[in-house]
């Protein structure tokens, strides 16, 4: 039978704690005391009146315990006779009727909330209508907070707003069993109110202090990012009535808050007129629960759908204790059982009308791609996209919105949702797109396309590339708000999903020029159609079996899913699952990309900037071109010590994990070493000659290369940057440990010591080099030894430490042996001295490691 949420209250909860204790062999919490003739406690004589009082108390307690539990009858408390009526108390105030009626007292600046009934659950969340504007702090305009399942509860003159605990449940028809679970786990009282007036069961409370507070925890965000100590200044905070509204199914209260602080950090100083006073706006949303009837779909790790989970203590011992369900919007066919049907109610998304053209139109076009997936799932016009009209509040829970947010520096875009914690039903999708991503993409395009031959061109090819990226970005973030996680393996399967992180696919024309016209795919991907069919398709009959068949059929076509946990860690093992990569084979694509990069750098010059721009700003455009292969290096490195695997289920017949073959690993090692060759690190001398120091008014930013040379451009620092990025990934201690383990299981596979030997041969290869190339090679050697020393010092696996130490000892007798003279002897001599000092306990690699700051990489567009 399909699970369908039919109630309007919380799920029934249960826990058989006593039985669980017996079954687990644990001692009961309060074991019955065995009969005994003497008390373990000293006897204290009691007077006769005290004995009578105690006896009466015990009798009363016994009688109370003997009574069956009763359901309280809603009645108005007797003590409320002295309370005024709501009409009397709110006379002269502005009333806004809705789910929770509001009363605004203009004279005192207070706002009152009418509570129609106690113990009725609803959803409460906060948001940030007016943000801070710093990507690093993270307090973006219209950012959503976490949703909470709450209810008002009254005790005499006090009303508490209680957050329910939805992580522990007992889904059972036995009310006592359910109550046992509910009472076993703590709830959270969010706020306490005093009753001001009453009409029967309806009460009025002063909500001013509840709403005029930092409920979104902006102060915490400032503290966590080390931006100073801030507190709420109530004298500079107030209810913001223009955006305080009440509707039949939601009540919205907005407030202006001023956070006062001392010693504000750099990020705050960058974005506020007075960094000691940060004035923002926060909103409190009180939302009715969705109507009953939402169909809960059991989660499947192969499907890419996010979800909710909870422990169900009412499950039998052989049942599924942890329950998991997919998070989805409510979508139903008008004609159940029809192969294709219009929906009962379509899913509609609104694009922020503050986004400028042509970006706004690109956002609309890219978001509309999702209708292709819903059509493939059997729907007709089930997914629509419109521009947000002025009459719709973007934070109103009734509307799905794509927000265009501005920040001082570039940063992530992301998609979120307001979700019913009981069922996983998505009530509101909400996307926040960082506007500076488009400008960063434009910068990338300028560097690759070199569009300014005369210096006044409009760079139309670059703009077309950026708009293609914006379309894909909109589709990606909306995918999250439809319930789907990243699918980072799709690039290795032919760019089959918008839920991947796409690197621009740049190629060379037949004449050798760089071609940016096919940078991004158009339209929804084949995997996305599979995911939407699994998540939103109608499956009459045996749903579980039919859902499984969707994923089995997809696998047969080569369409699978791996996500963040498989791609984001620097030690991750999948050779096919990466961020910002391209190509079916990571190493082959790295070699192709190196050819494109070489051509782009050879061509690079003043045609990358407009006429009249300071020549020093060439470096701004140079950085993404020089680091063009940055993420493909990471992808190729994951082949080393790599393991091919999938999310498998018992009985699906899918093979288990397999180590990447030795030949492919060794090819990857050689390709990575080639990246570090001086020829691939050096900049054209003609380009270096065009890069003056930064001029007046053009301060250096974190988007530029680090430098040891002060004000002048440092031609060595870019190469040192690539070396640092490469060795941080390649000589990761978990990757090293995996290579030790793989070699132990199969000696034909390269072990960690084999990796070190192979890299040493490449890095210390003797060849006639120019002074520039020789110095770059010395920096690579320094970085390599620093990383090996770090592993020898602090790797958690002892065998990794041992093999790293052995490699260092071997270097002292070969590459770094005494007596080496000539060019570079000072560099190699210092390396040898540092290794010997470490072996003597007089050198700490973590303290001595070459420090170089790498320019920010991610995002190239989304989260």
Describe these PLM feature segments:
Residues 387-405, 468-524:
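The catalytic-center signature of Zn2+-dependent metalloproteases
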